[in-house]
Swiss-Prot record:
One of its GO terms (biological process) is cell differentiation. Residues 46-65, 80-104 have a biased composition (Gly residues). The gene is TWIST1. Pfam families: HLH. This is Twist-related protein 1.
Amino acid sequence: MMQDVSSSPVSPADDSLSNSEEEPDRQQPPSGKRGGRKRRSSRRSAGGGAGPGGAAGGGVGGGDEPGSPAQGKRGKKSAGCGGGGSAGGGGGGGGGGSSSGGGSPQSYEELQTQRVMANVRERQRTQSLNEAFAALRKIIPTLPSDKLSKIQTLKLAARYIDFLYQVLQSDELDSKMASCSYVAHERLSYAFSVWRMEGAWSMSASH
């Protein structure tokens, strides 16, 4: 019987079955190795991705804990920078205020200069006008009781001119002037004063 088993030929179907059974066994280790490599590579990639993030997190959050002195220093530095910025802004605002303040005195000085010049011109005009009226009062015959304003002085000057015109047109004065070379200024002044008091100037002014 042993000889029959050993000597019995193996059928091709049995060979194919045995080969098919051996092939999965052979293929399993490589797949297991590849799976292990993939798992390792995925773990490495995950570890690498978490590593920088963890390092960054450790550098930011882990390294500077809320109660750590490093974070306190950084907080002070950031506060100092913020204060410096605000101080710089305040300085800029102060500079703007100084520039505007520098412009306002100049405009005030210009206005003050214009006012002074206007006052000087007004004084000169008033002085020249007073001098002209003083000269006119010397020519016009006035009474001792006269305290004439500028308008009254001008009206009196107009009346005196009218009186002189009437004197020149008078026939009686023409006959008197034929015998006299001239009529004294005092007489004209007296005649004009009488003429004023009698109100003859109002009658002549109405003509």
